[in-house]
Amino acid sequence: MKQELIERFTRYVKIDTQSNEESHTVPTTPGQIEFGKLLVEELKEIGLSEVTMDEKGYVMATLPANTDKDVPVIGFLAHLDTATDFTGKNVKPQIHENFDGNAITLNEELNVVLTPEQFPELPSYKGHTIITTDGTTLLGADDKAGLTEIMVAMNYLIHNPQIKHGKIRVAFTPDEEIGRGPSHFDVEAFGASFAYTMDGGPLGGLEYESFNAASAKLTFRGTNTHPGTAKNKMRNASKLAMEFDRQLPVEEAPEYTEGYEGFYHLLSLNGDVEQSKAYYIIRDFDRNHFEARKNNIKDIVKNMQEKYGEDAIVLEMNDQYYNMLEKIEPVREIVDIAYEAMKSLNIEPNIHPIRGGTDGSQLSYMGLPTPNIFTGGENYHGKFEYVSVDTMEKAVQVIVEIARRFEEQA
């Protein structure tokens, strides 16, 4: 199993599948279509049925039941794309067998070193086989580790028919990293009662709480005149943006928050005297606090409009996704089965809120309750990203055990 994980994963990460927020096509990049087509062929080779890829790049497949019991249809999902935060082109995965727990020089020429001082969890992987970058790209373990694990788990179940299971549906979605993964996902066609995203991090991760999320785009309009004669005439749009930001609580930003704490996050700010644009995201686990944050932004805008004129600021605010907990609680048994599966494999479940979102956040509100499970990756979205193959193997075992337990309890 370990060799299959390494072979598939290292092959998959070499395909550039970064999504593109500026694109309006679905999927947003051609690499995702290329990858999807490859997976369609490999799913067929493994022996899955009903293998499809639609024109928008959504891949679906079925592992038929091998039991006469009436078992709920369960699904496993991962996403095709990788993050936009750092380049994912020409990924050169580096395999480190029997890792000694010490610093790894990823790139001598560029002096890129993965150190325990910077990443304290690193020594805990001593003895593992880990896969790193070469220091020039991200790795793409988010989410090609999860995708690989699903492929290997399906292959394992087909070759071990003594493990009884109900019908299993598999799906690989595009554009998750830019929040569009479920936008064109056909829940009815997928046909599962519930599902699990394989899109978590270190060993034991089991997540079923996510942020409530919104975006706020602000356009500040100024009046430009010659600075020598600007008194009582100039209105500086960039300074309006700065004035707006100063009215948000300084300590309620990502760099000062953790756990269940929400935040405002200024993603980008650019402009000049004539016009300036600021793009924020708003996050909170508590729905009331989430609404209060959005109202705070609206109030600041209203007060500044009264001061500078209604045309001085334009606000566009949109909800992105909601805390999946509300939709998971009524079917709590899907979390319990995953929890029990981990415990039976001597994995200590690490239940914590997702300080972000997964496809499951949106899918849960589309009628497909979908918690999230670990994949074995660390330091996602950058050159220090790595994955433990040993933990990937554990994730495969969890998928298999979840399928077995649903059949056993039917």
Swiss-Prot record:
GO-annotated cellular components: cytosol
Binding note for cofactor: Binds 2 Zn(2+) ions per subunit.
Catalytic activity: Release of the N-terminal residue from a tripeptide
Disulfide bond positions: none
Location in or out of the cell: Cytoplasm
EC code(s) of this entry: 3.4.11.4
This protein's UniProt keywords: Aminopeptidase, Cytoplasm, Hydrolase, Metal-binding, Metalloprotease, Protease, Zinc
Gene Ontology terms: biological process: peptide catabolic process; proteolysis
Keyword Hydrolase: yes
Name of a matching Pfam family: Peptidase_M20
Molecular function as annotated in GO: metallopeptidase activity; tripeptide aminopeptidase activity; zinc ion binding
Binding site for Zn(2+) 2: D142, E177, H381
Swiss-Prot/TrEMBL cofactor(s): Zn(2+)
Active site: D81, E176 (proton acceptor)
Enzyme kind, highest EC tier: hydrolase
Residues holding Zn(2+) 1: H79, D142, D199
Xref: InterPro entries: ArgE/DapE_CS, Bact_exopeptidase_dim_dom, Peptidase_M20, Peptidase_M20_dimer, Peptidase_M20B
Protein family membership: Belongs to the peptidase M20B family.
HAMAP family xref list: Aminopeptidase_M20 (MF_00550)
General function of this protein: Cleaves the N-terminal amino acid of tripeptides.
The protein's name in its UniProt record: Peptidase T
Organism: Bacillus mycoides (strain KBAB4)
